[in-house]
Curated annotation (Swiss-Prot):
One term under GO cellular component: cytoplasm
Pfam families named among the record's database cross-references: Tyr_Deacylase (PF02580)
Name assigned to this protein: D-aminoacyl-tRNA deacylase
UniProt-annotated location(s): Cytoplasm
Similarity-based family: Belongs to the DTD family.
Function: An aminoacyl-tRNA editing enzyme that deacylates mischarged D-aminoacyl-tRNAs. Also deacylates mischarged glycyl-tRNA(Ala), protecting cells against glycine mischarging by AlaRS. Acts via tRNA-based rather than protein-based catalysis; rejects L-amino acids rather than detecting D-amino acids in the active site. By recycling D-aminoacyl-tRNA to D-amino acids and free tRNA molecules, this enzyme counteracts the toxicity associated with the formation of D-aminoacyl-tRNA entities in vivo and helps enforce protein L-homochirality.
Subunit structure: Homodimer.
Keyword RNA-binding among record annotations: yes
Higher taxonomy: Bacteria, Pseudomonadati, Pseudomonadota, Gammaproteobacteria, Enterobacterales
Catalysed reaction, written as an equation: glycyl-tRNA(Ala) + H2O = tRNA(Ala) + glycine + H(+); a D-aminoacyl-tRNA + H2O = a tRNA + a D-alpha-amino acid + H(+)
First-tier enzyme category under EC: hydrolase
Length: 145
């Protein structure tokens, strides 16, 4: 399971002109589910994302996690993160989980974030989404479990 996390001043996601999720300061989490991922890997990745210290403390040192910084998270499904880009000029998606399984694990990941106390908004799985982001930094990390 892959999370591309971006520190945001604000972020939102919409489907067909309707906003489905919106946050102020926090993290935009683009989530890719791979074959072999499990609820345990989703929970482990949620722990890692929520605990990752990429927000500035009183000395402007990256020392606070999203919850310590008072931020929220916006989780958006992104199957393209599981793409194989090693050969050719077209990505391959055979490493991605089947859509039904990926949706269950995406929902479970978001539920884990909520259960761990994070204010959590989401996109809509497998929809054609428009994502808006004001990136803070920019600060972007690729996390994988």
């Amino acid at each position: 399971m892959i999370a591309l996390i971006q520190r945001a001043q604000q972020a939102s996601v919409s489907v067909a002109g309707e906003t489905t999720g919106e946050i102020g300061p926090g993290l935009l989490i683009l989530l890719g589910v791979e074959k072999g991922d499990t609820p345990e890997s989703a929970s482990k990745l949620a722990d890692k994302v929520l605990g990752y210290r990429i927000f500035g403390d009183e000395n402007d040192k990256m020392n606070l996690n999203v919850q310590q910084a008072g931020g929220s998270v916006l989780v958006v499904s992104q199957f393209t993160l599981a793409a194989d880009t090693k050969k050719g000029m077209r990505p391959g998606f055979s490493a991605g989980a089947a859509p039904a399984e990926a949706e269950k694990l995406y929902d479970y990941f978001a539920a884990c974030c909520r259960e761990k106390g994070a204010t959590t908004e989401t996109g809509r799985f497998a929809a054609d989404m428009k994502v808006s982001l004001i990136n803070d930094g920019p600060v972007t990390f690729w996390l994988q479990v």
